[in-house]
């Protein structure tokens, strides 16, 4: 059996074609559909998460993301990478998962997340430096 990394492109192509068919069915069934195309990404997947975002966006034109598993060793590097990758066409992150329970799914607040990432109080408002 080939390693998972070599399987990824084939499974992605299959999923992408299936998603395109679903999208076409939705468009035929209701004008303006689908209204949202949200991808849930495992925050521990690193570089694979970036490839998933690119592949799924190409297939169905994503409107947002949910990033899970940001409570362990994944401290948000995938968020920074996705932001860097998508500078010309930003993709909103609606929720982040910081645990195993439904209650651990939180609305994503970029400033709070950035403050926490660098060790500041999440509630600290930004300050302007005197020039």
Predicted ranges, named:
Residues 1-12:
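Single conserved hydrophobic/aromatic residue that forms the stacking wall/gate
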Residues 115-131:
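Non-catalytic terminal/linker segments enriched in charged/polar, low-complexity residues
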Residues 14-119:
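Conserved catalytic-core segment of NTP-binding enzymes
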Residues 8, 110, 122-123:
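General structural signal for secondary-structure boundaries
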């Amino acid at each position: 059996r080939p390693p998972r990394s070599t399987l990824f492109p084939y499974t992605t192509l299959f999923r992408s074609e299936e998603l395109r068919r679903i999208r076409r069915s939705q468009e035929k069934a209701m004008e303006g559909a689908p209204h949202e195309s949200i991808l849930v990404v495992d925050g521990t997947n690193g570089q694979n998460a970036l490839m998933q975002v690119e592949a799924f966006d190409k297939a169905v034109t994503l409107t947002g993301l949910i990033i899970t598993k940001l409570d362990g060793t994944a401290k948000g590097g995938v968020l920074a990478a996705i932001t860097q990758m998508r500078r010309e066409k930003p993709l909103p992150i609606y929720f982040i998962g910081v645990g195993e329970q439904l209650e651990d799914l939180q609305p994503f607040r970029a400033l709070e997340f950035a403050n926490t990432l660098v060790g500041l109080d999440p509630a600290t408002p930004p300050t302007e430096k005197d020039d």
